[in-house]
Amino acid sequence: MSSTTVRPSVNALATPLVEALVADAAKLRLSVSAKSGEARLVDAGAQARGSIEAGRRIAEICLGGLGTVTIAPAGPVAAWPVTVTVHSADPVLACLGSQYAGWSLADEGGSSGFFALGSGPGRAAAAAEHLFEELHYRDHAAQIALVLESASAPPASVVAKVAEAAGVTPDAVTFIYAPTQSLAGATQVVARVLEVALHKAHSVGFDLAKVVDGIGAAPLSPPHPDFIQAMGRTNDAIIYGGRVQLFVEADDAEARGLAEALPSTTSRDHGAPFAEIFARFNGDFYAIDKHLFSPAEVVVTSLLSGTSHRAGRLVPELVERSFA
């Protein structure tokens, strides 16, 4: 990807999607708070009930307006046939430059104990992560949006931190938040199936400039009131039921190497529901082999040769065990 190429503003593209979400708050079962001079807060699943459709739209906001998310009754897991499909014609910017939950936000010095990972186009306006140096990208926009996997609204300290980092006033920021246990939360997490493949491609050192297009799909996980079980189900949807196809401007050797490196089957921890793996490591998320966080099955198509290279495998029985 050339640094001289004119890059779209992910926040500008996402702004109409955010405004449509807010306008439809009642029918999507969302709660919106917008006080003068303060950040706009959209509760999509904490105190508000939220909805699957809200989660689908939030996923498109997370992609910075550079991707489409659809939900359809089809898929490889017979007992759970509803599938979330994600497509982007600019998957690196959409997934890594916007959707990736890479910004750690905490109530530093406060007493709330608030912590959440920020995702969505607001990340690109702040560019607080080293990843943006590698992407040669920073967004500049009058309005920004950030999505939080959280059961509570961000405290004033986090709002101030985000606004300052992005170079905007607090009232120019929209926070959309929902816990993984909610309908919207589960949906938008499963919609990260393409993103985890891009993140894995980055982590194994593949030249991201060669990634041209991408599409991914995973079964929609049912929500669970327990956080660990809910997190486990969304992870299992991708790890054991996720499928991704990347289209790369690379030769067959590179495409084959990428395909072989991407699937979750490369992980030493592959083979059990995520909640069980999490318990095995006593709740230490970072002790789990990072190679596990990948789609189950990957196809990498070389646009230079027309040959597609496949690796990994679906494990529908583990999806069914997790979702039951």
Curated annotation (Swiss-Prot):
The keyword Cytoplasm applies. SUPFAM superfamilies: Methenyltetrahydromethanopterin cyclohydrolase. The keyword Hydrolase applies. Pathway: One-carbon metabolism; formaldehyde degradation; formate from formaldehyde (H(4)MPT route): step 3/5. Belongs to the MCH family. HAMAP family: McH. Catalyzes the hydrolysis of methenyl-H(4)MPT(+) to 5-formyl-H(4)MPT. This is Methenyltetrahydromethanopterin cyclohydrolase. It comes from Methylobacterium sp. (strain 4-46). The lineage of its organism: Bacteria, Pseudomonadati, Pseudomonadota, Alphaproteobacteria, Hyphomicrobiales.
